[in-house]
């Protein structure tokens, strides 16, 4: 029979890593924008409008991704906390 094994520290580290991934993505996107900005500043008319619309969609998608990553991180952390509490209650039942 296999045992259930729960690594509380590892799960907390995974939740933190998921959350920090959001920051890394934002940093990379800002770097990309900084590289594009000089070129985009020269665009006019339809080119500028098309870029701005695409950039708004990109920003919206990035914000949505950040929300999803935050939700996943929080859910993992909450599950870990709940399992830790169940573990404490089980241990206390033997006292």
Swiss-Prot record:
InterPro entries found in the cross-reference section: ESAT-6-like_sf (IPR036689), T7SS_ESAT-6-like (IPR010310)
UniProt source species: Corynebacterium diphtheriae (strain ATCC 700971 / NCTC 13129 / Biotype gravis)
Name of this chain's protein: ESAT-6-like protein EsxA
Other noteworthy facts: To improve expression in E.coli the proteins were cloned as a single protein in the order esxB-esxA with a cleavable thrombin tag.
Subunit structure: Forms a tight 1:1 complex with EsxB.
Pfam families according to UniProt: WXG100 (PF06013)
Entry coiled-coil feature ranges: none
Source organism superkingdom: Bacteria
Similarity comment: family membership: Belongs to the WXG100 family. ESAT-6 subfamily.
């Amino acid at each position: 029979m296999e045992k259930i094994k729960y690594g509380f520290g590892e799960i907390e580290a995974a939740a933190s890593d998921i959350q920090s991934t959001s920051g890394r993505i934002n940093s990379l996107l800002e770097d990309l924008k900084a590289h594009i900005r000089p070129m985009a500043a020269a665009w006019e008319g339809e080119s500028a409008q098309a870029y701005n619309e695409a950039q708004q969609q990109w920003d919206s998608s990035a914000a949505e991704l950040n929300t999803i990553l935050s939700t996943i991180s929080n859910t993992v952390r909450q599950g870990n906390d709940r399992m830790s509490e169940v573990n404490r209650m089980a241990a206390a039942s033997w006292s």
